Design a protein with these regions (language model features):
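Mixed-charge (Asp/Glu-Lys/Arg
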Residues: 1-36, 42-147
Length: 147
């Protein structure tokens, strides 16, 4: 089987996430073209939320799910990395590559990348640590609906 390109992996992630929201009973809207900073909008009972889908990878130790939180464009003058802000999107949305668990993470708590941990750090650090269970899709939908 032919290996998937980065672009195709991104398309599969985005389409899988849109389907997940549809299966939950929420409407999904998509902008025309690819000129917007968000990938799609989810209508949570009248609350419109801009989502940016991101393909995630497991870290080598398999205790973290990692995804980039910037868009990268390539052209003749080089590589251009642009951070997402609260003006661009509301949430990043990703899916575990094996279990297909969906995670929804607020843009304003992410830096250059996001690591969602499945186990606490061995050194006991708590500051800046994002536990994956706190951002599971169903839990985050409840928070969005109640905010």
């Amino acid at each position: 089987m032919k290996e998937l390109t980065v672009k195709r992996k991104g398309i599969l992630t985005e389409e899988s996430l849109k389907l997940w929201f549809l299966q939950k009973g929420y409407s999904v809207s998509v902008p025309i073209g690819d000129d917007d900073r968000y990938d799609f909008i989810v209508d949570f009972d009248g609350k419109l939320v801009k989502m940016q889908s991101k393909t995630s990878n497991l870290t080598r130790t398999v205790d973290c799910l990692n995804f980039a939180t910037a868009s990268i464009k390539y052209n003749a003058s080089g590589t251009h990395r642009t951070q997402y802000t609260i003006n661009d999107i509301d949430y990043f949305c990703t899916m575990h590559p094996e279990t297909k668990q969906v995670y929804i993470v607020p843009v304003d708590i992410c830096g250059n990348e996001c690591n969602l941990r499945f186990t606490p750090p061995k050194n006991g650090q708590k500051k800046g640590v994002k536990m994956a269970e706190d951002y599971e899709g169903d839990k985050m939908i409840e928070r969005i609906l109640n905010s």
